């Protein structure tokens, strides 16, 4: 069976990896010069099932309104993006209820748990290294009220296997001593001992090398222009370097997925949400953190990758623009140095690497996985802010579906048809 995977990020590369193990002849196509060069390149690095708390939740619409006009707001909506996303926005608002938020959180948690288990197996099978840190994750909060609110949500997910402990500030410092200098600035946090972190880019590139050694054709530097279809099936891929064809196709182009399939009558409710990261050398910060830390109220995180430290966060809805905004990058740095004064020692414009990537967000948070209205086109997209967490599991599950097998995880809750309104294949 010949399969073309469109996209060489974490989702596409892991799909290719598992397809090879199913015996497929695999071609991966990506416009970048290598694997993991877009959203997978410099994300926060959290492999965190605790991120299953959806963005679409009660209280979020009011927060967005309060943040309007603030360049340093945790979530910034550019007016120029509104005309292109109003349908998505209405769906997002419809999901901002307690019941729907919990349902979305449960689906995300199930996929996260499955995916982390798959990651561990892949790591054992390949023996690759990617600056992984297997020490859990702490989410800190500024007040007892905020801790209680977070705890109430996570308590509802505990029956599904979410393991966490509530800590005061001293308890957080005991796990991550780098929090010591700012212990008076936060009330405490939640510790998730089963979580990990690591360099998604390194991991994706290493898996791509494994795929190449296993016989996959990696067509980097190749722009996908269009999909050709006839009789309810995809017949080929038009690229700037010629036409490609296969028996089956997997769409894993992240935020760009809707643009490719819209001419075919498929409507993917995905909008790009720009995120930021600033990566700095750790050498100038004696006692730099090793446990990944997320500040849930200020919406940023700090993680360690070997000799590097990365601050990440922010959500900016501004279309497909990936240009860094200095005010937003500085806002992340300000928050990071407030929580970790030692982080300030690392800041130097000559060595700081500011990066922006586009999170492919669905209006209810879980990704879109599974079949499409074209018999041989499969979807692995819309992973939002959890692409690194979801990538391994989503790749294995979709690969099983492509191979005609039943995935280990039930994909009904991640299917495109949960949004009900997407068109059928166009007639010839």
Label each residue range with its predicted role.
Residues 44-170:
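Dinucleotide-binding Rossmann-like beta1-alpha1 core, especially the glycine-rich loop
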Residues 148-160, 180-248:
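Helical element adjacent to the flavin cofactor pocket in flavoenzyme catalytic cores
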Residues 43-46, 51, 55-95, 180, ...:
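Active-site substrate-recognition segment that forms the wall
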Residues 140-145, 170-175, 272-273, 281-284, ...:
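Flavin (FAD/FMN) cofactor-binding core of flavoprotein oxidoreductases
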Residues 103-116, 139-149, 190-209, 323-330, ...:
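Short beta-strand to alpha-helix junction loop
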Residues 7-9, 31, 36, 383:
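Glycine-rich Rossmann-fold phosphate-binding loop(s) that bind the pyrophosphate
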Residues 21-41:
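Glycine-rich FAD pyrophosphate-binding loop
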Residues 2-28:
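N-terminal Rossmann-like FAD-binding beta1-loop-alpha1 element of flavoenzymes
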């Amino acid at each position: 069976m010949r399969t073309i995977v469109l996209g060489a990020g974490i989702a596409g590369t892991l799909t290719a990896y598992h397809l090879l193990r199913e015996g497929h002849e695999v071609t991966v196509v990506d416009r970048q010069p290598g694997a993991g060069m877009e959203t997978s390149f410099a994300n926060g690095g959290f492999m965190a099932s605790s991120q299953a708390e959806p963005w679409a939740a009660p209280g979020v619409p009011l927060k967005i309104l309060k943040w309007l006009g603030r360049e340093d707001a945790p979530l910034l909506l550019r007016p120029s993006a509104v005309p292109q996303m109003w349908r998505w926005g209405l769906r997002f608002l419809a999901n901002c209820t307690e019941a729907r938020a919990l349902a979305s959180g449960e689906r995300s948690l199930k996929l996260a748990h499955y995916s982390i288990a798959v990651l561990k197996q892949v790591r054992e099978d390949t023996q690759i290294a990617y600056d992984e840190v297997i020490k859990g994750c702490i989410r800190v909060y500024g007040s007892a009220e905020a801790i209680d609110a977070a705890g109430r949500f996570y308590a509802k997910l505990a029956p599904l296997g979410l393991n966490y402990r509530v800590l005061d500030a001293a308890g957080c410092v005991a796990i991550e001593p780098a929090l010591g200098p700012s212990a008076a600035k936060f009330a405490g946090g939640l510790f998730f001992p089963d979580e990990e972190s690591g360099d998604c880019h390194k991991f994706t590139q290493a898996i791509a090398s494994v795929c190449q050694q296993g016989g996959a054709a990696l067509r980097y530097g190749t722009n996908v222009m269009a999909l050709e279809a006839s009789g309810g099936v995809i017949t080929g891929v038009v690229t700037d370097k010629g036409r490609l064809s296969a028996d089956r196709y997997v769409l894993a182009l992240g935020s760009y997925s809707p643009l490719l399939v819209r001419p075919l009558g498929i409507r993917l409710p995905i909008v790009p949400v720009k995120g930021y990261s600033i990566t700095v050398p750790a050498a100038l910060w004696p006692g730099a953190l090793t446990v990944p830390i997320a500040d849930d109220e200020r919406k940023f995180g700090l993680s360690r990758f070997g000799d590097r430290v990365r601050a990440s966060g922010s959500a900016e809805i501004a279309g497909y623009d990936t240009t860094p905004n200095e005010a937003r990058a500085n806002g992340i740095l300000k928050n990071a140095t407030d929580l970790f004064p030692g982080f300030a020692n690392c800041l130097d414009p000559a060595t700081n690497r500011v990066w922006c990537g586009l999170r492919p967000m669905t209006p209810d948070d879980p990704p879109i996985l599974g079949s499409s209205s074209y018999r041989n086109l499969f979807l692995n997209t819309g992973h939002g802010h959890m692409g690194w967490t979801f990538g391994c599991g989503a790749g294995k599950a979709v690969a099983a579906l492509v191979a005609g097998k039943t995935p280990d995880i039930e994909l009904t809750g991640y299917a495109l048809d949960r949004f009900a309104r997407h068109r059928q294949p166009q007639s010839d």
